[in-house]
Design a protein with these regions (language model features):
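Polar, glycine-rich mid-to-C-terminal structural blocks
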Residues: 213-277
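N-terminal helical capping/dimerization or prosegment-like subdomains
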Residues: 1-95, 325
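Acidic, glycine-rich active-site loops and adjacent beta-strand->loop/helix elements
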Residues: 87-89, 153-161, 184-189, 212-214, ...
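A generic structural motif
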Residues: 124, 214-216, 332-340, 369
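A common structural junction motif
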Residues: 87-88, 240, 244, 349-358
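Active-site metal-coordination/substrate-binding segment of hydrolases
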Residues: 78-151, 445
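An extended, acidic, His-containing surface patch that forms the Zn2+-binding/catalytic region
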Residues: 190, 248-325, 337-346, 354, ...
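Acidic/histidine-rich catalytic neighborhood of metal-dependent amide-processing enzymes
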Residues: 117, 122-199, 461-462
């Protein structure tokens, strides 16, 4: 019987090639033009779970893209781990900023990944990290090392807000019964510094539309006499932060819980170089809410950011018009206790109230979700900590993530289960950005570490 380390070493080329093949499929859930590719990816995941040793695998249809469910129940008296991941990916735009085509994976060395990293859309978020669990399952079943029951729930709509997952989970509570939920869709502090994500921010995502005249107008004939929707929109957006970068929406901070000085001091122990941070982003200064560090701003504090803005003429050359409409997409990252639906309504009310005369404003809510905190005294956290210690040789550092996985709070509500976030990516892996990548070392280390979580969770649960 092989150890997991030797099994991974013996099969690393195959593991890598399988992931590369998966990354070649453009499973972009946000674009209907890629529907066939998303469905193809679901089929590939189904086959992979079957080969990995699941006794039962099915493609569960939804009103959108399907959920791939798989399980191996060895003894109903043993604990059950539910693995969640997603096979859909973000759109790759802007394509001109990629150094290589986003769905033609290439391996290149980087400063943080001297062993090489796979560059492709979905490499880290989440195909690479999701597939670690499939290969870990393969090892455990092939070597009779699976110590408990396991269920897989891999969806194809995470990047569009998991719009059909809530209904599926609510309708399949008994089927999805588990003792802990395991997700790898987060990151580590550094390649040699393992960490467990203990908190996620919530999310409220909206689109705003400002309408002025009933058609585009000649800027010479009408400029200065009619409200310009683009000018109005940019001014309204600028007013959403004050001079200290606090968000000005009334009631926005009412339910924000401030961390104690002791908790902030614990956060500050995580290794962080501000100079390296700025260098990696090619910026000469950081920005954010006054009174907080960079790590605090992007994890324990709520934010409001414009994700896209457009209107008027943006083609080549000049066209002197006053646009009839202007648009923006805005996301608000929220901290635990902030309800995303309440925040959405607060934003909508405020944004509509600050519109000047001469324009009409429409706010359209999109998706959202609640924040989440994992208790560090839970069995799942302790098992994850022991697993990282086993393979990295050091105890992982708990950290709050600035990102959002809205379904985590849904799982706790519907399934009454805690979620453990065992991520192996790095913040510098450029998820959602051009040149997304995932270190080969990280990928293989994830496969090596996950079986230890199964072992320790089963032991601690008894």
């Amino acid at each position: 019987m092989k150890t997991v380390q030797s099994y991974v070493n013996d099969n690393k080329d195959r593991f890598l090639n399988e992931l590369i093949d998966l990354l070649k499929i453009p499973s972009i859930s946000a674009d209907s033009a890629y529907k066939a590719d998303v469905l193809k990816t679901a089929d590939v995941i189904k086959t992979s779970l079957e080969k990995a040793g699941c006794d039962h695998v099915e493609i569960c249809e939804t009103e959108g893209f399907p959920i791939v469910y798989g399980e191996k129940i060895i003894d109903k008296n043993l604990p059950t781990i539910l693995v969640y991941g997603h096979y859909d990916v973000q759109p790759p735009d802007p394509l001109d900023l990629w150094n290589s085509p986003p769905f033609e994976p290439v391996i290149q060395k980087t400063e943080l990944h001297p062993e090489g990293a796979i560059f492709a859309r979905g490499a880290c978020d989440d195909k690479g990290q999701m597939y670690m669990h499939v290969k870990a399952m393969e090892y455990m079943t092939a070597n009779n090392e699976l110590p408990c029951n396991v269920k897989f729930m891999i969806e194809g709509e995470e990047e569009v807000g998991s719009i059909n997952l809530a209904k599926y989970v609510a309708s399949n509570r008994e089927k999805l019964t588990n003792d802990v939920i395991l997700i790898s869709d987060t990151g580590m502090i550094a390649p040699d510094v393992p960490s467990i994500t203990t908190g996620l921010r919530g999310l409220s995502y909206v689109e705003v539309e400002v309408t002025g005249p009933n058609r585009d107008l000649h800027s010479g004939l009408y400029g200065g006499a009619v409200a310009n929707p683009i000018n109005v929109l940019t001014k309204m957006i600028a007013s959403l932060h004050d001079e200290n970068n606090h968000i000005t929406v009334p009631g926005f901070y009412d339910k924000v819980e401030n961390l104690s000085d002791a908790e902030r001091a614990e956060m500050a122990k995580a290794p962080f170089s501000l100079d390296a941070y700025k260098k990696a982003l090619d910026i000469d200064a950081v920005y954010g809410e006054e009174g907080y560090t960079t790590n605090e701003r992007n994890s324990i504090r709520p934010t409001l950011d414009v994700n896209g803005i457009w209107g008027g003429y943006t083609g080549e050359g000049a066209k002197t018009v006053i646009a009839s409409k202007a648009y923006a997409k805005i996301s608000m990252r929220l901290v635990p206790n902030q309800d995303w639906e309440d925040i959405t309504e607060l934003f909508k009310t405020h944004f509509e109230s600050i519109a000047p005369k001469g324009v009409k404003v429409k706010v359209t809510p999109h998706h959202g979700g609640q924040g989440y905190v994992t208790p560090i005294d839970s069995i799942g956290y302790k098992a994850a900590s022991k697993a990282y210690k086993q393979t990295f040789g050091k105890t992982p550092i708990p950290q709050r993530s600035g990102g959002s996985i809205p379904i985590v709070s849904l799982f706790e509500k519907e399934l009454k289960s805690k979620t453990i976030l065992m991520g192996f990516g790095l913040d510098s892996d450029a998820i959602h950005s051009p040149n997304e990548h995932f270190g080969i070392w990280n990928y293989l280390k994830g496969i090596e570490t996950i079986p230890w979580f199964y072992k320790y969770f089963t032991e601690l649960k008894k």
